[in-house]
């Protein structure tokens, strides 16, 4: 893994008046490029083969230049070239997936956020330790499938985009659906409304919703649209569907906007605060954008089952701002908020606090 000291050495050669914001052309890159351009940065899109043609349809978000690779792993070998352009990499899920975790953490280019958070997020045991230390309610984990007494969610290790999930209500259903060649986690199925909560933690701002160090913002929230789970039950009851050979899947295909009851916002902020404070104690903080995936029950309990320590695709709903971010700054997207953080840190000589 690249060290903080190495990153600081790279920054000594940077022209901070000519920073380039770069990411892989996927996931939330249009939003990232749009936000960077609004804050006066040059942008660089990373892609394999020729640049995506559909980017031409969005001129305000199309990057100023492209870095075309034969393979995403070749990005590691282009680090010096990127540094000469004063590049800061903005990670998103696709970037980490295409590069691989080891390549991402070892990439010799200054990167927004704390790369150590990937290790804590992707390791289920470490993530559980993080959540439990933060005092967060989580769905009960079931170690032995024979102990399944009601609906459970089974998730395969490394599930991406909603692939690798299934629901079972007893051991028999579990046995019929499980792939024993893969590692999996079983936890109770929580009945409620799913919320993806989009936060931003700034270690360099000391106004707004302040923490022991820095401040916390709630930028937006969304709910996932999943195929085929969101439409399948129009065809019949779950048992009828299974008998017909049709099983629900949870592949992410899009997102829809949400706002929460105002009375819940206090708990939503407390939840984010607990996550950040514990991250500061464990590994130096979850800097920048992050998302808590939770279910809010009919008794208004919030149970957390996942965390993403970077910008998530649900924020793409709010390129022109959300009902929450508009109350802080007009037309503030998560992509633009990232660019603002970099801009403010560069001006105040605090890039060391937000890059890794």
Curated annotation (Swiss-Prot):
Keyword ATP-binding: yes
A Pfam family annotated for this UniProt entry: DUF1297
GO biological process, one term: 'de novo' IMP biosynthetic process
Family to which the UniProt record says this protein belongs: Belongs to the phosphohexose mutase family.
PROSITE patterns, per the entry: ATP_GRASP
Protein name (record): 5-formaminoimidazole-4-carboxamide-1-(beta)-D-ribofuranosyl 5'-monophosphate synthetase 2
Cofactors (names): Mg(2+); Mn(2+)
EC number: 6.3.4.23
InterPro entries: ATP-grasp (IPR011761), ATP_grasp_subdomain_1 (IPR013815), IMP_biosynth_PurP (IPR023656), IMP_biosynth_PurP_C (IPR009720), IMP_biosynth_PurP_N (IPR010672), PreATP-grasp_dom_sf (IPR016185)
Primary role: Catalyzes the ATP- and formate-dependent formylation of 5-aminoimidazole-4-carboxamide-1-beta-d-ribofuranosyl 5'-monophosphate (AICAR) to 5-formaminoimidazole-4-carboxamide-1-beta-d-ribofuranosyl 5'-monophosphate (FAICAR) in the absence of folates.
Catalysed reaction equations from the record: 5-amino-1-(5-phospho-beta-D-ribosyl)imidazole-4-carboxamide + formate + ATP = 5-formamido-1-(5-phospho-D-ribosyl)imidazole-4-carboxamide + ADP + phosphate
Gene Ontology molecular functions: ATP binding; ligase activity, forming carbon-nitrogen bonds; magnesium ion binding
Alphabetized PANTHER family for the sequence: 5-FORMAMINOIMIDAZOLE-4-CARBOXAMIDE-1-(BETA)-D-RIBOFURANOSYL 5'-MONOPHOSPHATE SYNTHETASE (PTHR38147:SF2), 5-FORMAMINOIMIDAZOLE-4-CARBOXAMIDE-1-(BETA)-D-RIBOFURANOSYL 5'-MONOPHOSPHATE SYNTHETASE-RELATED (PTHR38147)
The organism of origin for this protein: Methanosarcina mazei (strain ATCC BAA-159 / DSM 3647 / Goe1 / Go1 / JCM 11833 / OCM 88)
Residues at which 5-amino-1-(5-phospho-beta-D-ribosyl)imidazole-4-carboxamide binds: 27, 94, 255
Keyword terms: ATP-binding, Ligase, Magnesium, Manganese, Metal-binding, Nucleotide-binding, Purine biosynthesis
């Amino acid at each position: 893994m690249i060290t903080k000291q190495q990153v600081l050495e790279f920054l000594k050669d940077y022209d901070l008046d000519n920073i380039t914001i770069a990411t892989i052309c996927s996931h939330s890159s249009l939003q990232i490029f749009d936000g960077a351009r609004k804050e006066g940065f040059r942008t660089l899109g990373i892609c394999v083969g020729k640049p995506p043609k559909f980017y031409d349809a969005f001129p305000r978000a199309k990057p100023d230049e492209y870095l075309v690779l034969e393979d995403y792993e070749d990005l590691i070998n282009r680090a010096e070239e990127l540094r000469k352009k004063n590049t800061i990499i903005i990670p998103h899920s696709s970037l980490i997936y295409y590069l691989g975790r080891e390549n991402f953490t070892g990439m010799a280019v200054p990167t927004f956020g704390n790369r150590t958070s990937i290790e804590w997020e992707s390791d289920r045991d470490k993530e559980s330790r993080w959540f439990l230390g933060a005092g967060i309610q989580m769905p009960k984990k079931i170690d032995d499938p024979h102990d399944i007494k009601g609906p459970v969610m089974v998730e395969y290790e490394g599930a991406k985009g909603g692939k690798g999930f299934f629901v079972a209500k007893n051991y028999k259903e579990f046995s019929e659906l499980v792939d024993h060649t893969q590692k999996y986690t079983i936890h109770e199925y929580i009945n409620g409304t799913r919320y993806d909560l989009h936060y931003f933690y700034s270690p360099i701002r000391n106004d707004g919703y302040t923490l022991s160090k820095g401040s916390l913002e709630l930028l937006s929230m969304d709910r996932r649209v999943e195929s085929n789970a969101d439409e399948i039950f129009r065809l019949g009851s779950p048992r009828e569907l299974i008998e017909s050979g049709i099983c629900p899947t949870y592949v992410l295909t899009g997102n829809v906007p949400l706002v929460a009851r105002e009375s819940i916002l206090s708990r939503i902020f407390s939840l984010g605060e607990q996550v950040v404070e514990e991250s500061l104690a464990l590994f130096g903080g979850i800097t920048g954008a992050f998302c808590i995936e939770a279910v809010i029950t009919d008794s208004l309990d919030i149970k957390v089952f996942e965390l993403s320590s970077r910008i998530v695709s649900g924020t793409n709903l709010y390129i022109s701002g959300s009902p929450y971010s508009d109350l802080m700054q007009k037309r503030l997207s998560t992509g633009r908020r990232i660019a603002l953080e970099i801009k403010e840190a560069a001006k105040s000589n605090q890039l060391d606090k937000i890059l890794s």
